[in-house]
Amino acid sequence: MFVYGTLRRGEDNDITRLLPPPRFVGLAQILGTMYDLGAYPGVRLVGRSTVLGEVYEISPALEAVLDEIEEVYPQERDEYVKRVIPVSVQGCVLSCIVYEIGLRYVHGKAVLPDGDWTRRSPAL
């Protein structure tokens, strides 16, 4: 699982606080565009910018919990779509799940050019 926003360590939905516990694999970058949606980010898997995140090995049970948090349901096309993409971590290419934001949700939203949610400017 590649996480880039509120699921990162120290953020509101820190994946390391969820059960069953995930195993940290490493830091990674993917190609994409990160948008500031207010309380959380969204990433579109397009563009030549990089998005910074963390990779975790997760169980199917934790995947189901994460799907609930991100409101991903197989029957519906909602805010996030679950994708599987190749991610390079410490010289190994892994197939990782990532939650991609739907196009209609980023219209008019600000791009975070450095692609790092943890470095965003605090809300005023």
Which role fits each region the language model picked out?
Residues 1-124:
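Glycine-aromatic micro-motifs
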